[in-house]
Structures are given as structure tokens and as C-alpha cells.
A protein has these predicted regions:
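Phosphate-binding site recognition
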Residues: 1-213
Length: 213
């Protein structure tokens, strides 16, 4: 993604190649190419409520190990081994951001389709009660975003989250009440979210295929 390459410390030698003829290339910010990137994609997480924790842990562990490998020249020795001794995504992310903080390293965390599996869970009425328990109180998903939030006071200096709807984020609000929803901002109305034209096209389509109630 554009943000990934703009902020990734590993891409600093390609900055002119990628952005030299663009406005952001001619007006660079101080933080360009100064971050270590963690990029999660929850679209690959199993949507079955009983299995999603295991799937989330597996995906995060794969990404965290990749992170340790590609940034090995910047990270302290033994970080990967120490991280893999922790149990699950929550403990591993907590370990990574704390160790990066000790070494004055900055993390940019990307989470794509953060609500992919929770939206599928919500489509099953029988799962609603379990979903609520996971996004409230001591639920695992809630704990994960609590950890992300805690990390923003440490080495996770930036976080960019994308999804289909704000439903899950609303349920996680008190656990992750540090974000800004750009999909409702007029300044970004053609960048994220649906335009009025998009909505009208969808309504016209479904009007011909299903009866509205």
C-alpha cells in the first residue's frame, strides 16, 4: 500500500523512485521511512466463533515472525525466539511492542478487514451472545484491541485499520477509543466508505432481486 511504502524504513532508498514526482514526494514529512511495519489481514481468520481464536493466533504469529525476519537488522538479538515463547497473539504483540520501545523503534500497525470474521459471525443469529462476550469485558478480541491501544502509548506510534462497517469497532469502543473514523469525513468521502452513488446503485440492484421490508 501507499502508506506502507511511504513509512517503511526498508523502503527509504526507493523514496524518490516511488514518490519523487508526486506531491508527497516533493513535500515529505519528517516521519517518512522511519517505521517498522506490521501488516495484519483478518480476512484470512477463520470466521467460526469456536475456531477464530486459534486462527487469529496463527495468522498473527506468521506475521510477527515475518516482522522479526525482515527487520532483523534493526531488532535486538533473540527477539524472535522470545516472542515465540509467548502464548497467542495478545501476549506476542505485547512482547513485541515493549521490546521495540526499549530500543527506540517505532511500529506502524496496519489491520486490513478487521471485521471480516466478526461480520460473518454476526450473520448467524445463534452466535450473537457469544459475539457480544468476545467484544465486551474480557473477550479475546477485546483483549487484542486493548493491547493495540496500550501499544500506542509505547512503540506503536501509528495504526491504520480498515473494515466494511463500524459495527465491531463500536462494540470495541471503550477498548479502542483512540481512533478516528475517516469514512464519515467529507474530506475523505471518495477515499473510504460508500458514496451516495454507490448506495443508490446497491439499492436499485437489490430492489430488482429481493423484496424490501
Amino acid at each position: 500500500s501507499m502508506l506502507h511504502h511511504y513509512y517503511d524504513i526498508l523502503e527509504k532508498d526507493r523514496f524518490e523512485e516511488l514518490y519523487g514526482d508526486l506531491y508527497i514526494g516533493q513535500h515529505p514529512t519528517e516521519e517518512r521511512n522511519s517505521y517498522l511495519i506490521i501488516q495484519l489481514n483478518f480476512a484470512v481468520v477463520n470466521a467460526e466463533l469456536n475456531n477464530y481464536r486459534k486462527s487469529l493466533d496463527a495468522h498473527c504469529n506468521t506475521v510477527f515472525n515475518y516482522f522479526c525476519d525482515v527487520y532483523a537488522d534493526y531488532l535486538p538479538k533473540g527477539l524472535k525466539e522470545g516472542m515465540n515463547q509467548k502464548n497467542g497473539a495478545v501476549e506476542q504483540l505485547d512482547f513485541l511492542y515493549r521490546e521495540c520501545e526499549k530500543n527506540d523503534l517505532k511500529i506502524y500497525l496496519f489491520i486490513d478487514e478487521y471485521d471480516h470474521f466478526t461480520n460473518k459471525i454476526l450473520s448467524e443469529p445463534a452466535c450473537l451472545e457469544e459475539y457480544q462476550s468476545e467484544t465486551h469485558g474480557t473477550g479475546y478480541l477485546r483483549s487484542f484491541f486493548d493491547t493495540v491501544k496500550a501499544g500506542t502509548y509505547s512503540s506503536i506510534k501509528r495504526c491504520f485499520v480498515t473494515g466494511v462497517s463500524p459495527v465491531t469497532m463500536d462494540d470495541l469502543t471503550s477498548g479502542f477509543n483512540i481512533g478516528t473514523n475517516y469514512s464519515t469525513s467529507p474530506e475523505f468521502n471518495e477515499l473510504v466508505g460508500f458514496t451516495e452513488e454507490d448506495v443508490r446503485e446497491m439499492l436499485d440492484y437489490y430492489r430488482t432481486t429481493a423484496e424490501f421490508h
